[in-house]
Amino acid sequence: MTRKQRYEWMLDYFRKKMPEVQTELEFGSEFQLLVAVMLSAQCTDKRINQVTPELFRRFPDARSMAQVEADEVLEYIKSVSYPNAKADHLVKMARIVVERFGGEIPHDMDQLLTLPGVGRKTANVVQSVAFGKATLAVDTHVYRVSHRLGLVSEKDNTPYKVEMALTKYIPEEDIPRAHHWLLLHGRYVCTSRRPHCEKCGLNDVCPSAARQGISH
């Protein structure tokens, strides 16, 4: 099977299984999405969704968060990973959004990357989910699933290389959904330590499943 055929199989499977798919993070605005994504680094969406309702009631927008110190934000996010660093980044981000962008989250990738605590993965999520752009964020789930399914080569050994490889084969109209497809597949089926290959609808074409002697 060629790599192109593998992509076609994968895309056909997910289009049928998850035609409508979206982030599991809960938010009410572009600012709140950015905050939630920043908080989600090395933390589960479930945990973030437990924290953000109170956080967003207190800080619904960039202007309200920009007016306080990190210690006040910290009180709302103590249960997430690296709370001190994230609180610091959130306040600095909010202040820059207010000062440079009039309180609105910028659409431009380069401008997003100037915000404290915002890397390429976070910027891609915001561009895709908030602004509908054809960007594909590569987190640990997307990275793992892409390699296990043989969608990328061993040489694609960084998130950026995986992103470039995936977007080369995935049609532009499917790129926003593809991030969620691969992420959710990695979160619930192709898990890190004990992947559920026996119930995976892609095991017929998965090199990793084949090595374990598993297929339909």
Language-model features and meaning:
Residues 2-216:
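Catalytic cores of DNA base-excision repair glycosylases
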